[in-house]
Amino acid sequence: MRLHEYEALDIFEQNRIPVPHRGLATTMHEALQVAGEIGYPVMLKAQVLVGGRGLAGGIRTASTPDELKDVAEELLSSDIKGLPVRKILVCEKAEIARELYLGITIDGYSGRPVIVVSTEGGVLIEETAQTAPEKIAAIHIDPSFGYYPYQARSLLRMLGLKQQLIAPWSDVIGQLYDIALRYEALIAEINPLVVLPNGGLLAVDAVLEIDDSALSRIRRSLPDRAERIENPLERRGREIGVTYVDLEGDIGIISSGAGLGMASMDIIGQKMKPANFLETGGGITADLLYKCMQLVMMKPDLRAIFINVYGGINPIHEGAKGVARYIAEHKVKIPIVAKALGNHQEETWEILRAAGVHVVTEAATEKAVEKLYELVGPAK
C-alpha cells in the first residue's frame, strides 16, 4: 500500500525528519488559506498515487494569491496519468543549496534492506545509476544484526562528503530506517533531500510504500487500502477478489496464478502490448471467471483477450462456463485465445470452443501466444 505524499510527510515529521511547513487543500479557498499561513512563495503538489507528477504538470509554484488561485483551480480540475486530482498539498518553497537522494528498499536477490544515497537528488535514481554511477553509494543491512549509525557514516564517506554534511545526513538515514522497519516498508524514499543555505536538511518529498502483507501487524492509524486504489479497474479487481494491474496495451489477460500471468505478459509483450495483469489467486469458478471477463472488457480499445489457466484441484470447466456465459450475454466480437490445462481439461475445451474461443491445447504458453499473434498481429 503506497501512502500519499502528505501522509508520508506526517509520518516522517513524527519521527523527527525535518519536513516543510505545509497543509492539505481540497478547494482553491482552502489552498489560499494554507498559503496565507505559510507565506509565499509556495509549492502546490497534486496528491495522486503515481510517479512522475512533476513531468505531468502536477507540481507547480505560486508566488502570489492571484497566481495560486489559477494554479489551484487548474490542478483540482485536472488528472495526472488518468487519476483525478482531488487534493493538493500546499507547502513552503524551500531555498535550495543542494539536492540529495536517500532511499531504503528491499533487495530482491538477498531479501535484505538496502540503503541507497546519492549526491544527485531531484532526479530518478535509475537515471543517476546510468549517467553518473559514481554519485551513488549503497549498503545492505543484515537483519540479524540490525542497523548501526556508523554504517551510515561509512556510506556517506564513500561519496567523499565533508563532515558537516555527514553528521546530519546520517541522522536522517537512521530515522528513515526506523520508519522503514516499523512500517515494514517496501520502499521509503526522500527525493530530493534538500540542503538549505544554512546547512540544514529538509525532506521536500516523501515516498512510503508498505507491504500489504504487513498491514494486519501494524497497529497504527492507516487508511483502508481499498480507499487509495484510485484506478477504477484496479479497485474493481480488489472488490471481486483478484489481483488486477492496469497497463497501457490492448491485449487483455486472465490467468489463474501470478506465474502464469507474468509469463503471459512477458511473452505477449515481445510483439504485442498487454492491457493488464490479472490473476485469480487460484480460484476458477464460473462466477469469478464471468466477473474477470467483465473486468477485462471494461478496458477500452481491446483487440483480444488471452486466457491462461491451470487447474490441479480446481475443476477448470467451471471457469469455462463463466467465460462462455459472458461471451453469449455480451456478444463479444474480439478474438479470445485460451490455454487451459488440468482438471477436466477436455470438457473445458469443448465449452470454450462452443463459445467461439480459440483453444490451444499445447502446454507451452508460447504456442498460445503464436495463435494470438496470428489473429491480431503486432502492437499498434
Q: Where do the model's predicted regions map?
A:
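ATP-dependent carboxylate/acyl-activation modules
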Residues: M1-I190, V194-I307, G319, L341-K380
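C-terminal hydrophobic structural anchor segments
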Residues: R303-G342
